[in-house]
C-alpha cells in the first residue's frame, strides 16, 4: 500500500512555485545580473505563450504518466532503489540525487542529438535570460520528454512522494538559475558549492558554442564537475545570450518558434557574416571552477 504522505505535496507545489516565480521576478527587476538587450514587451508575450503550451503538456501528459509510473513501481517494489533495503528517508534522498543525475544526462542528450536539439533550441533562442525563460520550451520537447520521465521513474523505482518532491525542486531550481539576478559574489560562490546558480547557468546560454556545451546540471552542480563540463570563469558582462544564427526579431516571434523544429535550419552557431563567436583564454580569468563577477 502507498502511504497517504505520498500525495501530501501535491496541493502545495503549484502555489509554492508561483511564489518563487513572483519573488524572483521582483528581485531580478531590482538587481539585474545582465543588461537586457530586448524590451520585455517584445519577449514576454512569446515566452508566456510558449509557457502555456508547456504547462498544458505537463499537466495533461507528463505528470499523469510519470505519477502513474511511480505508483506502479511502488506497488510492485520495482526498480533500482528497491534492490537495497534502505530506510524511507534515505530512499527519498538517494532517489532525488539519482533523478538529478539522470536529468543531467538527458539535458546533454538534448544538445548532443540534432533531432532533439531542433526542439530544445527554442529554449536557447531567447535573446535575453530571465525567470520567464525557465519554462520557454517547445511543447514538442515536453511531450517527447514524457518517455524519458516514465523510464527514469520506472527504472529507478521512484515512489510518488519522491517524484513530486523532485518535480518541485526541479521547477524551483530551473527558475532560480534562469533568473537575471545579481547575487553578491561571495553568496553565489557559497551557494554554487551545491546548487546551480544564475551566473553558472548564464554561461550555458552564451552564443559561444563551447560555453553552451558546459553547465548542464539542473539542481546540483556536482554533475558538471564529475563529467568535466563545469565552466564558471566567464565574466557576465562579456556574455551575449542566445543563438548567433537566430538573434533577429523575425526568429523570435511565436509562430516561427513553433515551426522551427520542422524547418530546414541554417548553422545555429554562426553570425550572419559566417563567423563563429569565440572567447579567447585571456578573456576568462582564474580557474574554470570558480565563479567570477
Name the predicted role of every residue range.
Residues 1-10:
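Short, strongly hydrophobic alpha-helical membrane anchors
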Residues 12, 16, 39-52:
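Loop-to-helix transition at the N-terminal end of transmembrane alpha-helices
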Residues 25-44:
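Membrane-interface helix-loop junction between the first two transmembrane segments
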Residues 52-61, 65, 80, 84-240:
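Membrane-embedded catalytic scaffold of the fatty acid hydroxylase/desaturase
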Residues 63-74:
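Membrane-helix interface motif
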Residues 225, 236-293:
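Cytosolic-facing loops and C-terminal tails of multi-pass membrane proteins
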Residues 16-26:
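Hydrophobic core of alpha-helical transmembrane segments in multi-pass integral membrane proteins
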Residues 28, 48, 223:
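Residue-level signal for inorganic ion chemistry
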